């Protein structure tokens, strides 16, 4: 399986990488939170742009991105607008969503974008090609905050992302039972062993799914999300605790 290198970070080798999400509503808070995050032990900074209030002003969005880049120049920056239908803060048209991601790519300020699988096949393929032409990596994602589908469906979605040339396929699912967590882990392992030719990220959410956020190195998930202050999804644990557990499992 090939790895993905962003800046000096090799994703898909060694312990799972820690991603933290910054969810500030305005430029002032972007700046203050970035300064606080800078003191934290993590690997990738995800900017959750759907929390940013002045979204219609592309210049304002990119000014905030510039602050993040300048505050943490060594950290890979993942630009994510999470749509309302997949658990995000704001609804957005497909056209505006694609335009926003293209603006981020054009800015030269971001290393990676998050692109939702179910945006529309043609739009997804075109945006992946556009990102790659500008040396920006793509995390292709799918989130279900209500249920966990069968393992076959989980694998099918991850394989579809791979077929669309995502650099890193990602899926996050809500368990209704502990067996749903096992379904996610089994699907992750099967994908990683039989189909994946690149790193994947998977997680089962809420308290029930916490084990999936810790056991990525065992089952085949290359990264996990930790909380600096407020969790961006149910079940996230603090980055310090997360690093401790990932290190223990890596060194065992």
From Swiss-Prot:
InterPro entries, A to Z: 3-dehydroquinate_DH_AS (IPR018508), Aldolase_TIM (IPR013785), DHquinase_I (IPR001381), Type-I_3-dehydroquinase (IPR050146)
Active-site residues (renumbered): 143 (proton donor/acceptor), 170 (schiff-base intermediate with substrate)
EC number(s) per entry: 4.2.1.10
Metabolic or biological pathway: Metabolic intermediate biosynthesis; chorismate biosynthesis; chorismate from D-erythrose 4-phosphate and phosphoenolpyruvate: step 3/7
Subunit structure, interactors included: Homodimer.
Family per record: Belongs to the type-I 3-dehydroquinase family.
Name of the protein in question: 3-dehydroquinate dehydratase
Species the sequence originates in: Shigella dysenteriae serotype 1 (strain Sd197)
Gene field: aroD
